[in-house]
């Protein structure tokens, strides 16, 4: 396989909302393909008509595109092994089943679940042991008798009588002893192929060389290797792919992150204002690291460094605080003009309007780029620029406004009313002269009431720049209105 082009696949089922574990798997496959100069194949496993949905399929496409994980073959782009939706490949799967039956690699099984349990009980075994390989050696007469009863057989693969061992690229040598895995079903009674068949068959037909997937699928690997061995013997494929089982992603405590956990929902992170660079960087750290002292890296740097053999086999815990911190770093790394574009797009998607022209919006964006963790934080800092969204927080008012603030507000109003140029340096100079020098106040005492009056909060972008953006009229109106704040009640409107 060393001279063969690396081909990996990402094959989600279109059910529910894309979750971070699924996307981590996609990322590791994508990065390995790009690192090796190979192909990233995207295949949809839509074999469960009762659970699959077009909405979920479109959500997966949306997720991959938003993150920039492009695929070389698959839905929307095509490729040499079309179709890439398993529901459209049934005839290919049935043909492999036919060949397996003809070669004696598989057989028809008529036993019901109740009959299997009864045989286990009669032999003093646990009735929940699973299939007992009873139908392996049925005679043609016995099969005919079952058909005469109206029974529809499933097709089962004959498991080998030897140990199944593979060198897992993450976990090392892994062995399942002979006899541990019973003969397993490849089809339903109506002949429809099952996931246990279609997944490895499609991997074989699409010449997948490496299977990178979650460790929850490790128990199915001996079955798949046995099926591969059978497919080699009947000429469907000529090799078995390398397997790498990625570590579980844990949530709180030692519990595996569930699809029901909010932090597992990819789109909730996007809605909060994660940017692709930040989220991908964090997901990469769930089982892999680029260096012991280097947690912040780009996707290009990951591609250069990524080798699946470096993935850690220990479970990885999803730490929201660390994810947030990494996202904040990537927001800071954006070029200013790129940050403006991202923030404007985010605000538009969430119905946030500041009422600023392009140049003023760029100034506002610059004020918050180093002060936010996710894009959503920017609205909380900048919404004071929208008169409809502006409101004085009662807690902030109780802390900073009231009778003691009146001299400060009056001095500020007097200093600002006489300004000829409404610029940040002029505003800063006038206020420092009036409050720091004139009233001999410390900066916090001088500017705390002004910040709450102008922005409605104790935490805001830089005060003087905020006043310039707000404009002289609205700034002075808010300062005047703040004088009337008594006992948590005051005029918060901008109409004088």
UniProtKB/Swiss-Prot annotation:
Motif 'KMSKS' region: chain residues: 256-260
Subcellular location, record wording: Cytoplasm
Record's catalysed reaction(s): tRNA(Glu) + L-glutamate + ATP = L-glutamyl-tRNA(Glu) + AMP + diphosphate
GO molecular function, one term: tRNA binding
The keyword Chaperone is annotated on this UniProt entry: no
Record-level GO cellular component terms: cytosol
Keyword Aminoacyl-tRNA synthetase: yes
BP terms from Gene Ontology: glutamyl-tRNA aminoacylation
Protein name: Glutamate--tRNA ligase
Alphabetized InterPro entries for the sequence: aa-tRNA-synth_I_cd-bd, aa-tRNA-synth_I_codon-bd_sub2, aa_tRNA-synth_I_cd-bd_sf, Glu-tRNA-ligase_bac/mito, Glu-tRNA-synth_I_codon-bd_sub1, Glu/Gln-tRNA-synth, Glu/Gln-tRNA-synth_Ib_cat-dom, Glu_tRNA_lig_a-bdl
Residue sites binding ATP per the record: 259
Function: Catalyzes the attachment of glutamate to tRNA(Glu) in a two-step reaction: glutamate is first activated by ATP to form Glu-AMP and then transferred to the acceptor end of tRNA(Glu).
A Pfam cross-reference name: tRNA-synt_1c
Tree of life domain: Bacteria
CDD domains associated with the record: GluRS_core
Subunit (UniProt): Monomer.
Record motif 'HIGH' region, residues: 12-22
């Amino acid at each position: 396989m060393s001279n063969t082009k690396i081909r990996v696949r990402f094959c989600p089922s279109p059910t529910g909302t894309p979750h971070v574990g699924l996307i981590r798997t996609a990322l590791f496959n994508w990065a390995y393909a790009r690192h090796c100069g190979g192909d990233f194949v995207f295949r949809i496993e839509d074999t469960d008509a009762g659970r699959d949905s077009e909405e979920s399929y479109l959500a997966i496409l949306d997720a991959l595109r938003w993150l920039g994980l492009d695929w070389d073959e698959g839905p929307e782009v095509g490729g040499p092994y079309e179709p890439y939706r398993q529901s459209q490949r049934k005839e290919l799967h049935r043909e492999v089943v036919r060949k397996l039956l003809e070669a004696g690699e598989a057989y028809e099984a008529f036993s019901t679940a109740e009959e299997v349990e009864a045989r286990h009980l009669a032999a003093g075994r646990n009735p929940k042991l699973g299939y007992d390989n009873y139908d392996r050696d049925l005679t043609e007469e016995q099969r005919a008798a079952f058909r005469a009863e109206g029974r529809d057989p499933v097709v089962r693969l004959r498991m080998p009588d030897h140990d199944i061992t593979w060198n897992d690229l993450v976990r090392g040598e892994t062995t399942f002893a002979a006899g541990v895995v019973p003969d397993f079903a490849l089809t339903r009674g109506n002949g429809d192929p099952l996931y246990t068949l279609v997944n490895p068959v499609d991997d074989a037909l699409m010449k997948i060389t490496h299977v990178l997937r979650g460790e929850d699928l490790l128990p199915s690997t001996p079955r798949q290797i046995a099926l591969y061995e059978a497919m080699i013997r009947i000429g469907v494929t000529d090799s078995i792919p390398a397997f790498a089982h990625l570590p579980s992603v844990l949530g709180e405590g030692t519990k595996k992150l569930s699809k029901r956990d909010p932090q597992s929902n990819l789109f909730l992170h996007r809605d909060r204002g994660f940017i692709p660079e930040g989220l991908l960087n964090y997901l990469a750290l769930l089982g892999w690291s680029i260096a012991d002292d280097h947690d912040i890296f780009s996707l290009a740097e990951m591609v250069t460094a990524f080798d699946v053999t470096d993935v850690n086999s220990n479970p990885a815990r999803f730490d929201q605080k660390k994810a947030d911190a990494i996202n904040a770093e990537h927001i800071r790394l954006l070029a200013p003009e790129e940050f403006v574009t991202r923030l404007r797009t985010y605000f538009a998607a969430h119905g946030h309007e500041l009422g600023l022209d392009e140049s003023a919006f760029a100034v506002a964006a610059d004020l918050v780029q180093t002060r936010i963790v996710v894009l959503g934080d920017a609205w909380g800092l900048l919404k004071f620029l929208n008169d409809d969204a502006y409101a004085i927080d009662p807690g902030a008012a109780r802390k900073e406004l009231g009778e003691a603030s009146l001299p400060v507000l009056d001095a500020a109003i007097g200093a600002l009313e006489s300004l000829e140029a409404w610029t940040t340096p002029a505003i800063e100079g006038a206020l420092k002269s009036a409050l720091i020098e004139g009233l001999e106040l410390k900066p916090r005492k001088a500017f705390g009431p002004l910040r709450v009056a102008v922005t409605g909060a104790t935490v805001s972008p830089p005060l003087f720049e905020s006043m310039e953006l707000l404009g002289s009229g609205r700034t002075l109106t808010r300062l005047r209105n703040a004088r009337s704040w008594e006992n948590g009640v005051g005029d918060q409107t901008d109409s004088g």
